[in-house]
């Protein structure tokens, strides 16, 4: 009774009367219609929907206001989010007004080097997102350099530390030669979590730093106090962008809700 794609239109007034005279829906591809049937009857091909299928579902939900199709598409994207580059997810969030994974995708994006992001993505992400990303990268790089150059203070030495001066000097040197190098490595700068993991593996290579002082200092470093401000700034920026750029569509009525509404 319905046909999709670019089929020739039936004689005016006869569309929908029989299988030979279907109602043409030119905006709906065959794949979209098959996906709609999968949504309606909860029956999917064994391998499940592909990424392109999910995009078609989102387009279908936008065009025909199908809340169920939208919910299923967003669920699949969220489940598979770590298989996709964060900039691809952000572009989808902006195109289809999805807030669910905008913030975590932006947080992942910040860990990318600018040169590793394909040029066309700048246009897809738009001026606001790209400009915020570049500005944030500059601020975070500056913050990283400050942290690398300023070791956490050794406020109080352990009672068993017999040479406080030597302990403090070697602590400062240890920080610069290890943690600073991990953070500022020109070829492979490490994020804070990775840098801390490498730092605590130094083991006995701590010079004249007293072992008990080292344990206390390591606990301070692992708390990540110096990086909390950076994390908070990234999250706050992502939330502001999401609120400013994305407006989720109004909740669409399901078939059951439409039937209930029409019967009243």
Where are these regions (language model features)?
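Alpha-helical protein-protein interaction/assembly modules
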Residues: 70-197
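Residue-level signal for the start and early helices of compact helical domains
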Residues: 14-19, 24, 55, 81, ...
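Post-BTB helical module
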Residues: 28-125, 229, 233, 239-241, ...
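BTB/POZ (also called T1 in voltage-gated K+ channels) oligomerization domain detector
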Residues: 1-47, 171, 183-264
